Amino acid sequence: KIDIIVKKADATITTIPNAINDLAYSGEEQNLITEGSAEGGKVVYSLDGNTFTEDVPTATNAGEYTVYYNVVGDENHNGVEDTNAIVVTIKKATLTITAEDKSVTYGEEAPTYSVAYSGWKAQDNEDVLVGEITFECEYNTNSNVGTYAINISGVEAQNYEITFVSGVLTVNKANATITNNPNAINDLVYSGEEQTLITEGSAEGGK
């Protein structure tokens, strides 16, 4: 009697998983790598290097991820024991925060400043910002007519690269007002000399 032992063959990777390039935060889950395939087994993946599944790893937040993979053999094949690693980056999305333009009349208090947002992904809004928006403007109630920059800063976000855009505060001329009306001088009689006909008036913001 002759016993014949058939040893398992080694499984081989036929399609190597690759990092998906140019990933940027979208607010949704995204595949981190392309799907691999193997002859005589199946490719399995992990984000922690311990728990492996057949599901291609996904991620939502911006950051750097390490995807581990190896091959589990079928009943006739040995798996590939070596674990490979792929580093994948999801870049931050761009968020633009713009200080909205404002205007006041000379002498008025500074307005309530505000901003506009451009670039939110999915359902994101101001709630994802860390910090508080700070407004800086050189205008005060004694400032002259003209334009003043409204600068902003003070916030950041995990998934966004923030661009701050300054606004413009325009200070317009105020209307001059008469504070003392000129009045006719009564009972003038010819005297042969020049005479003042009215009392002198005065104005605020002019003459």
Which residues does each predicted region cover?
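Solvent-exposed beta-strand/loop surfaces, strongest in extracytoplasmic domains of secreted
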Residues: 1-207
